[in-house]
Amino acid sequence: GPGTGTPTYTIQGDINIALRGGHGEFPRIVVIPGDPNEAIEKTNEAFYLSEKFNSLSIVLSDKHLAESEFSVRGKPNKTIIPKINRNIPGKTIVKASGYEHDKFGNTTEDATLLKRNAEARIIKYQKIKKEAKRFEMIKIHGKKNSKNLIIGCGSTKGAILDAIEGKDFKFLQVLYLMPISDEIRKEIKKAKKVILVENNLTGQLGRLIREKTGIKIKNR
């Protein structure tokens, strides 16, 4: 998860590498829970999406979330059991190649097939996003009709909830960084004042929101 930063402390410094690290253009799922229940739920969802779409999932935790004490209310959502549709070694021949390959696992440099594979990976991302909408990609806390909006993710959740208690604010908690919810742009558009809260210097969540919505959040 996000690096521990200064020893014994925490930081949300690895959002960018989780979203963009790797070779080439390929879909991935990145979730960022804010409490123990969400950690269980989002990890389960990540496994489900990984198995369904044969894609990489990353669950971003951090030291604060991992080592804090929580009073947990309620139980996590019912576990989703993913269906395993891939070939299992020992039952059939399985070929794995880091090179571009055909459906049989054989390496190829055929231009038509390379183009088709690249396009298929982008189409897969759209399918992942559509499927992820069945889950909570964001949560709205506080006064739902407030025009004062705070945006955050991960372990900043607890501090933000304490800060807005009894005040005219609502808190948009981002749970999916990739795919990211289209509702974020709608919520920002409805607000008069938007504040971004994240535990890093460069505003990595803010960069992602600007990239996907075209909106730069100045107050952070």
State what each model feature region is.
Residues 1, 17-28, 196-207:
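Short, basic, helix/turn surface patches
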Residues 2-4, 38-39, 66-69:
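Short, well-ordered, mixed-charge alpha-helical segments that flank or form enzyme active sites
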Residues 6-25, 89-96, 100, 184:
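Amphipathic, alpha-helical segments enriched in basic
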Residues 9-58, 62:
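Conserved thiamine diphosphate
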Residues 42, 47-220:
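Flexible, low-complexity linker and terminal segments
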